[in-house]
Curated annotation (Swiss-Prot):
Descriptive protein name: 2-C-methyl-D-erythritol 2,4-cyclodiphosphate synthase
Residues involved in 4-CDP-2-C-methyl-D-erythritol 2-phosphate binding: 15-17, 43-44, 65-67, 141-144, 151
InterPro entries per the UniProt record, alphabetical: MECDP_synthase (IPR003526), MECDP_synthase_CS (IPR020555), MECDP_synthase_sf (IPR036571)
Catalytic activity: 4-CDP-2-C-methyl-D-erythritol 2-phosphate = 2-C-methyl-D-erythritol 2,4-cyclic diphosphate + CMP
Function: Involved in the biosynthesis of isopentenyl diphosphate (IPP) and dimethylallyl diphosphate (DMAPP), two major building blocks of isoprenoid compounds. Catalyzes the conversion of 4-diphosphocytidyl-2-C-methyl-D-erythritol 2-phosphate (CDP-ME2P) to 2-C-methyl-D-erythritol 2,4-cyclodiphosphate (ME-CPP) with a corresponding release of cytidine 5-monophosphate (CMP).
Length: 166
């Protein structure tokens, strides 16, 4: 076992939510319109991008996952804006002496098209995390009609973060 503290930490996050009629579709703090009026089901606003980034941040520091801090059994978090949750997570990260070096995320969805909203999502995340938007990469892809995303049963997101000790 080493006693040397690392200068960098990497975290990986993943989230998926089911698409349901009657729910809002919010990704990266942006309200999108699904052609079939579908939205993401979840206890909070079910923002898969924000959730995967939170899990990556928490994972990088071995702090568990978002369910530990914002359990679905707690009504306080019902329908909450996930950017609020993300701001709480980044406060925790900074209290431990870490800063974001960069974030890279990929959203997996057949519809709606995500690309037209990427810059707005980056601005929302930049403002919430208090980092330059050049530190944030967001990509979108389809699943070529394979799996739950391909069958439009859900939307998922994978995120990787690099933290640097300050």
């Amino acid at each position: 076992m080493t006693s040397k503290s690392p200068k960098f930490r990497i975290g990986n996050g993943y989230d998926i939510h089911r698409l349901e009629i009657g729910r809002k579709l919010i990704i990266g703090g942006v309200k999108l319109n699904h052609p079939d009026n579908l939205g993401l089901d979840g206890h909070s606003d079910a923002d898969v991008l924000s959730h995967s980034i939170m899990d990556a941040l928490l994972g990088a520091l071995s702090l568990g996952d978002i369910g530990k801090y914002f359990p679905p059994s707690d009504e306080k978090w019902k329908d909450v804006d996930s950017l609020i949750l993300l701001s709480k997570v980044i406060d925790l990260v900074r209290k431990q002496g870490w800063e974001i070096n960069n974030i890279d995320s990929v959203i997996v969805a057949e519809r709606p098209k995500i690309k037209p909203y990427v810059e707005i999502m980056k601005r929302n995340l930049s403002k919430t995390l208090k980092i330059d938007d050049s530190f944030i990469g967001i990509k979108a892809t389809t699943n070529e009609k394979l799996g739950p995303e391909g069958r439009e049963e859900g939307i998922s997101c994978h995120s990787v973060v690099l933290l640097e000790k300050k």
